[in-house]
């Protein structure tokens, strides 16, 4: 059975607190923190984008497992903030890690679930025998307009999974998807910041798709919440995934290890995948995981995963764990944040 052979993540070390953002806009920081349960968020440095984050995540995956990059037959990078409108991030990653010229490569877009769509495609290609290994990445440097509610959550980070049949540390037992035309969140071509239809954000979009996908997976696998050691959902904020977990009947001990948004914000395409990476950092053989992503527009991908004995053979500390990246912090104020995010335009448009 195909599954995750190795994994790696990257989270920028710069962080800003909602208190600092609220100070600039005259908001009540306690109201913000209690409302969305975000205590800090990651900020990309001026030289960091989806390409560099993807490369770092992929390199961290290769540090944990010595795989010949030339045996990677496909690379798919999911993001809604690719650095180029026309020029694939996937080929940049491939060149940086040394893959072969014979390669399936593409950039994916489906809001925050583009990375998990890549996981599904890579798994299908491995299962069919088209490739030996495939690399699926979810990464973003997400945007929020100055003063907008998204500015408190939109952050940066990403995760890479190499999927194959040999030496899997976590078998992907099954995957499924749901999708509908739901106008909860969008950004038109050329616009720097997204718009959101607030009344569609909760029940019609996130909860409808995440809850339905999770229930469909449990029905397919004939499982119940108590059968899982861990559960991880897409995390637009700290409140939505905890509410979804409780609605489905999961307990805090099952979702706490994958809940990262309170500390790094919403990494969009990297969100659920980075939560899963955090779980793999601490999981043991036999652990059963339910993972459900969400992308605005809208859809969800669900995965039923079982950790194998090979997880103990892997030296997970060969690459930075999520815990280590959470501890590696450099705080910035709003001025530095605005500068790094290119929100300050000077002169005749020179950033």
From Swiss-Prot:
It catalyses: acetoacetyl-CoA + acetyl-CoA + H2O = (3S)-3-hydroxy-3-methylglutaryl-CoA + CoA + H(+). CoA binds at residues 199, 239. The active site is at residues 80, 112, 234. Pathway: Metabolic intermediate biosynthesis; (R)-mevalonate biosynthesis; (R)-mevalonate from acetyl-CoA: step 2/3. HAMAP family: HMG_CoA_synth_arch. Catalyzes the condensation of acetyl-CoA with acetoacetyl-CoA to form 3-hydroxy-3-methylglutaryl-CoA (HMG-CoA). Functions in the mevalonate (MVA) pathway leading to isopentenyl diphosphate (IPP), a key precursor for the biosynthesis of isoprenoid compounds that are building blocks of archaeal membrane lipids. This is Hydroxymethylglutaryl-CoA synthase.
